[in-house]
């Protein structure tokens, strides 16, 4: 079974195939085992496709990945593959975040990624959302985030990043 699944993850995938993998994982109710097994695969296609399949999960299903929250953070920060990073950040953004979950290395990573002018819009936007969620717990960090957001030269960023930034600033001003 695992060899067939890995072969499927190695292949070029579309939405239909990603949903098929997700449904297989759902049937086995093994979201953590599947994610752990394939998120670090040496072939980035396997990791990317596995993570993409997990983005199809419902919020209650995704919440089953909460125990590997820190492993997902480590993956997002260490991967050289932008798709793996973006998909991992997408999953992290859907997980619960508590005050005690703050990792300064991850906050620094998110601040760096959200302001990187040459970055990918999906990564920038997700990093900005995650930085906001982390900073909400600490007024001094929130002030720093506001200064950083206001200092961003928005002429250099795509519409998706501008939109997330504006929504965050609007929510803080009301």
Regions found by a protein language model. Name each.
Residues 1-174:
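Alpha-helical scaffold domains
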